[in-house]
Amino acid sequence: DKFFYPELSALAEVNAMEARSMNRNPTPWNNVNLTALRIGSLNCAGLQAHYADLKVDYSLLKADIIHLSETSLTGLGDCQYPLPGFDVDHCVVGNGKGVSTYYNAKIAEQKVCLQLIKGDNFQISKVTLPRVDSINVYRSSNASIPGTLEALKKLIDEEKPTLVSGDFNLCYKRNPSNTLTARLLHDGFTQLVEDATQIQGGLIDHLYWRDCLEPIFEVPVVERTSSYYSDHDTLLVTLAEKSIS
């Protein structure tokens, strides 16, 4: 009988590749063994147009909270655009505007409240949880920056960890000192996104994070994916609480 044996160097390389694989080394977003709050933010370029795509966006669906902007809903009728395992609240304004927030059963049990701010040219959603608040903003390019900032500031709890996400239509690279960003940074927030988020090269999708003076959370881990159905990147934030020593 003849036997075939693997080349030892080839076998060693296979084992090395396996050790480096994503299955063995999942990112925080994909690590099922990591207890954390996962928040996804995406300009979906129209919820009705891309509803079927969202239902199979398995990376985004790992979120506990999904913030969608520029949903372009003109009305709901009998369709709430449900995602399996999620509740949803929509802020319906019209074409090229609007935000929707989906949250899973774990969040529904904890949720203190959900607020929606419906401006003509900006919309804001806030999910209040016992330990952290998650705020999402869609600001049209012609919206008043001071007006958007004023509405946002009214929703921010100065004593609580807060994540602010969304499409601000303000390029952080070209205009990092804009009034809204400058004020949030002055108030102790950190802008977590460093690279362009939109296909034309603008960094217009922002993530602002501020913890308590005595931090409750580890430094947020930001991951991103490029969805085929939107010209914006999806921003995925993993928030893990600090272990009590």
Regions found by a protein language model. Give the residues of each.
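Metal-dependent phosphoesterases centered on the DNase I-like endonuclease/exonuclease/phosphatase
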Residues: 56-93, 146-213, 227
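Beta-strand cores of modular interaction/reader domains in eukaryotic scaffold and signaling proteins
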Residues: 67, 101, 133, 163-164, ...
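N-terminal, active-site-proximal structural segment of metallo-dependent hydrolase catalytic domains
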Residues: 1-79
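Surface polyanion/phosphate-binding segment centered on an Asp-His-Pro turn
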Residues: 1-15, 162, 171, 186, ...
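Active-site-adjacent loop/helix micro-motif of nuclease/hydrolase catalytic cores
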Residues: 49-53, 142-149
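Conserved beta-strand elements of beta-rich interaction domains across eukaryotes
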Residues: 46, 72-74, 106-108, 139, ...
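Active-site-proximal beta-strand elements of phosphoester/diester hydrolases
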Residues: 36-46, 126, 130-141, 165, ...
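Structured beta-strand-rich core segments of catalytic domains in phosphoester-bond hydrolases
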Residues: 71-131, 137, 215-225, 233
